[in-house]
Amino acid sequence: MTYNHHYSINLLKKMLEIYSPSGKEKNLSSFLFNEFESTRFERVWMDKAGNVYGEIGSGTPAVLLCGHMDTVPGWIPVKIEGGKLFGRGAVDAKASLAAMISAALNLESEMSRGKIIVACVVDEEGKGKGIKQLIHENISVNYAIFGEPSGIKNITFAYKGHLKLKISCKTMTGHVGAQHLLPNAIEKGFELWNKIKNICEQKYKSPFGIFYSLTPTLVGISSRRTTGSIPDKCTLNIDLRLPPTINCRKAMKIIGNLIEDFRKENYGLTVNLRVTNRVEPYVARRDTIVVKALKEAIFEEIGEEAKLLRKTGTGDMNIFGTYFKIPVATYGPGNSTLSHTFNEYINIKEYLTSIKIYKRAVKKILESACRT
């Protein structure tokens, strides 16, 4: 079978037609498992988290190509229009994963040494269950490329970390007519949020830009429904993005101290803090064979120098790179400003070019590693 442009476009289209928000990747896992078994992958397996792996070649060096199957919720009708392929995950990040699969299949006949492992992981948009299981699988690799929308001319080498916080404020309740006597939990919750926002802006805003700043986002606020009573509970859900200078432990100390001071200022107020997810910030080295190979491949395919990016989001590279400490980078087609929107699409020409770039880069990594 020839893994040409038609195959690659059709593969991505089928992947987009299988709706796979975090926690519901089973159908896409099954599809890719069967696809891998029917193509040139020599070894195919699925782990207990639902990650799917395909292996080509053997021995060392070993290159991991890792992309995620899950998306944020929200179905988008799949269609091709004006050279664009629309669908949920077209940018983030099924195009990257499909391009990696196509690149690996097209490299199989050109490999003399080494191996490629393509990993299709679950829950990247959630709590990272997939990449954590991949680490537990004890896969032995020397280099890794992660598939996320950097844009065709760019390579991502750094991501911020994050803390997902759930903070609850509890007060005494009473008749709404006594609002002048009783504290309102919703108002207290919002006061606390403003203190968190202000301390980040005043003490942890970097002159070097948002990547180096501690940045909070209020992503949810809720309260108990009351009838004629003062609200006595308010819950804040906060996404705190961490620069490389502030790890999770330091960020927790900052927020914990602020909450303790807030408690002292508000007698009778109970404040509880819970961390629902944490990922450390990560900065990969820029002088590795992986970054060099991607830069050369981009220049050879499109005739322009690659730009190295620091991103304010968080990716599976954070968790993997922190654990394995091997050369890594993130690369993939797509305009990341379209991620998680209802106008998500991939430029088909860019997608096809990214396959060539992945292929060139992996070939360079394998050849260079074999020479050393």
Predicted regions and their residues:
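Hydrophobic/aromatic beta-strand patches that form the interior of the parallel beta-sheet core
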Residues: 63-65, 119, 143-145, 327-329
